[in-house]
């Protein structure tokens, strides 16, 4: 906090990971809280966040052009996703955790339109999405970054933070057209961790149509997907990752 005070900012922008520091930061300068709302959707949250910032700095036209570009790119990806099933998950500590459409990587099922089979199997244990205000309103204590991993090996439970650990037998039984994999250990720089490809390409996963058809997708920039989604630059990178595989 001392370093922030020394900068003497006129305004402070924070995301969900700093929501617990809202009060302390607000004593230094007005705080604008910018996070994502899973009920609204990642893309609309990004657009709203960008418009909030643009309104402060008079950059509305630039943001309008960027959001229009995102819409066109998403429409193209939706055509690729139409009629295809998928599982979306992250590898961490040698296991594979399924993600629903309620948190990280939710753009794949919600906006791009893949039929995320994990979304059908998870139990939404939270009543609503993560908080987003795009204003000086204090965020709720319950954000997507505050919740821990739940699950019993079947991929069931709230998936908003780290997903739910699923056995590889569960993945085989679901047999999706695509499997999207985000490497959490790479995203956070875990030393000595298994790479996502080493975890996923085992004898069981090799039985899936996704493996046989070359449709296991390893998201190229896991650090962005895991820690940075919610901004214009991050969304641009995420769409590029999907475009590189699907087009």
Please place each PLM-identified region on the residue numbering.
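Short helices/loops that flank or line small-molecule/ion binding pockets
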Residues: 2-8, 166-175
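Stable alpha-helical elements in mature extracytoplasmic
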Residues: 17-21, 46-49, 62-66, 73, ...
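Extracytoplasmic ligand-binding site segments that recognize negatively charged/polar headgroups
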Residues: 20, 34-52, 85-107, 127, ...
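Basic- and aromatic-lined ligand-binding clefts that recognize polyanionic substrates
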Residues: 62-143, 147-156
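Structured C-terminal subdomain patch of bacterial secreted/periplasmic proteins
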Residues: 44-48, 55, 64, 177-247
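Second-shell loop/turn segments in exported
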Residues: 9-12, 35-40, 51-61, 94-95, ...
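Acidic/His-rich segments in extracytoplasmic proteins that coordinate ligands and/or metal ions
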Residues: 1-56, 188, 244
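Structural recognition of the beta-strand scaffold that forms the well-ordered cores
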Residues: 11-15, 32-33, 86-89, 178-182, ...
């Amino acid at each position: 906090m001392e370093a922030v005070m020394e900068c003497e900012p006129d305004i402070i922008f924070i995301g969900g990971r700093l929501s617990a520091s809202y009060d302390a930061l607000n004593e230094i300068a007005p705080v604008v809280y910018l996070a994502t709302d899973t009920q609204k959707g990642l893309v609309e949250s990004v657009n709203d966040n960008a418009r909030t910032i643009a309104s402060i700095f008079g950059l509305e036209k630039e943001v309008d052009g960027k959001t229009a570009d995102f819409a066109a790119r998403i429409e193209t990806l939706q055509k690729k996703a139409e009629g295809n099933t998928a599982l979306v998950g992250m590898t961490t500590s040698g296991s594979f955790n399924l993600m629903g459409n309620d948190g990280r990587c939710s753009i794949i099922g919600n906006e791009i339109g893949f039929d995320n089979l994990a979304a059908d199997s998870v139990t939404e244990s939270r009543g609503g999405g993560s908080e987003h205000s795009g204003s000086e309103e204090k965020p709720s204590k319950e954000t997507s970054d505050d919740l821990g991993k739940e699950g019993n090996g079947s991929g069931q439970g709230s998936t908003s933070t780290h997903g739910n650990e699923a056995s590889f037998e569960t993945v085989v039984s679901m047999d999706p057209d695509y499997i999207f994999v985000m490497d959490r250990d790479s995203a956070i720089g875990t030393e000595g961790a298994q790479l996502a490809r080493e975890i996923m390409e085992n004898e069981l996963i090799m039985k899936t149509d996704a493996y046989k058809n070359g449709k296991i997708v390893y998201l190229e920039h896991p650090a962005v997907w895991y820690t940075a989604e919610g901004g214009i630059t991050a969304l641009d990178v995420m769409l590029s990752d999907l475009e590189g595989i699907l087009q």
